[in-house]
Amino acid sequence: MTKTYSTEIKIQNVRGLHARATANFVKVADTFCSEIYVTNKDGLRVSGKSIMGLLMLGAPLGSILTLEANGNDAEKAIKALTELVDEKFGEAV
């Protein structure tokens, strides 16, 4: 039985959800079988496994996004992606 998990994430790195951060997000998301979606405050919902989709969200520092995963490893996906965002995508800045 698959479950859906969701949480809100806050973009905390100075440059926001830019190309390198987005690539890191997709790299982690791709390790999971679950469907992963990210939605911005305007309701734009994109695949968490699409660099172009994530860039379309236009998420600068401080943006609140909804992260949703549906599948057998959805809970693990949400946890890993939330940690990545909380760690500012591994960027030193």
Regions found by a protein language model. Name each.
Residues 1-4, 43, 72:
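Short, glycine- and charge-enriched coil/turn segments that flank and shape catalytic ligand pockets
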Residues 2-8, 64-66:
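Intrinsic-disorder/low-complexity, polar/charged segments enriched in Ser/Thr/Lys/Arg/Asp/Glu/Gln
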Residues 10-60:
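Compact, glycine-rich, soluble single-domain proteins
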Residues 61-93:
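C-terminal structural segments of small proteins and small subunits
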